[in-house]
């Protein structure tokens, strides 16, 4: 199964695995699953580190590509079709990072691994 991590799941999986739900940890650990991470998560982490809103994640931001590679995650680029889809989503949720991750999940027909129920308004499948 392919699963797209939201940004909080990326952070918790790499910095604080016990913050993940048992199901989330099992999903990530299952080698039969392909774990996807959007470029939107890199953008969000870098932005929040720069603004001082993500204390303790500076090393993750600096070593992001190496950390993702070591974890075995597949990185998703942001393409024009996903950007258009994110902008066209009618849900009221305004977070641009969440909108992009939801658009990518919908385009790929994959579930999002996230604790955030706000993502449900996009009509995505969510695992937690």
Task: Indicate residue ranges for each PLM-predicted region.
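Short, well-structured N-terminal submotif of metal-dependent ribonuclease cores
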Residues: 1-38, 51-66, 70, 108, ...
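Generic structural signal for small/hydrophobic residues in well-ordered secondary structure
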Residues: 7-8, 45, 86, 105
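Alpha-helix capping/helix-boundary segments
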Residues: 9, 41-42, 82, 101, ...
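Residue-level signal for well-ordered alpha-helical positions
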Residues: 16-17, 48, 89, 125
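Short, conserved active-site loops that position catalytic residues or coordinate cofactors/metal ions
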Residues: 39-47
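Active-site neighborhoods of divalent-metal-dependent phosphate/nucleic-acid chemistry enzymes
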Residues: 55-65, 69-115
């Amino acid at each position: 199964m392919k699963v797209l991590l939201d940004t909080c799941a990326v952070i918790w999986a790499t910095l604080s695995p016990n913050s993940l739900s048992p199901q989330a940890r099992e999903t990530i650990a299952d080698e039969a699953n392909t774990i996807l991470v959007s470029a939107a998560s890199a953008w969000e982490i870098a932005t929040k580190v720069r603004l001082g809103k993500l204390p303790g994640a500076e090393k993750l931001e600096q070593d992001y590509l190496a950390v993702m590679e070591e974890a075995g995650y597949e990185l998703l680029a942001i393409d024009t079709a996903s950007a258009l889809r994110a902008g066209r989503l009618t849900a009221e949720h305004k977070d641009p990072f969440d909108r992009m991750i939801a658009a990518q999940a919908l385009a790929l027909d994959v579930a999002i691994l996230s604790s955030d129920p706000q993502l449900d308004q996009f009509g995505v499948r969510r695992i937690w």
